């Protein structure tokens, strides 16, 4: 069963290292994606005065292509937009356009209040 959990230890860093991913992140919080207790993905969020800043999203290659990256991204955005007016991405990528982000300087940004997630039951559009 899938679940997402914020973590503050170094387990996400170890996971990424074992996956061959090298990144220099600023201090923040990792959000881990687990399937049946095994970490299969991670996102890293740093914090500015007025924004949560997504610095990276990773899903193990064997589990890509089925929407898990979207799931992890949306769960991370949901967790960190409740108390800050902005959610930013530290780099530019067309991937984030579908979430409503706009390019700004070297990254992308969206107003937290503008984030909505469509549901399959029609509750949100």
Question: Which residues does each predicted region cover?
Answer:
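A generic "binding-loop/recognition-motif" signal
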Residues: 29, 50, 92-94
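STAS-like cytosolic regulatory interaction modules
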Residues: 107-125
């Amino acid at each position: 069963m899938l679940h997402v959990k914020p973590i503050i230890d170094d387990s996400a860093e170890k996971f990424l290292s074992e996956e061959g991913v090298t990144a220099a992140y600023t201090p923040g919080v990792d959000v881990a994606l687990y399937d049946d207790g095994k970490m299969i993905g991670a996102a890293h969020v740093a914090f500015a005065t007025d924004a949560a800043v997504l610095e990276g999203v990773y899903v193990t290659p064997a589990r890509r292509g089925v929407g898990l990256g979207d799931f992890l991204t949306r769960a991370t955005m949901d967790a960190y937009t409740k108390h800050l007016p902005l959610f930013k991405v530290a780099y530019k990528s067309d991937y984030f356009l579908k979430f409503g982000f706009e390019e700004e300087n070297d990254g992308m940004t969206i107003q937290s209040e503008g984030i909505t997630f469509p549901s399959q039951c029609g509750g949100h559009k």
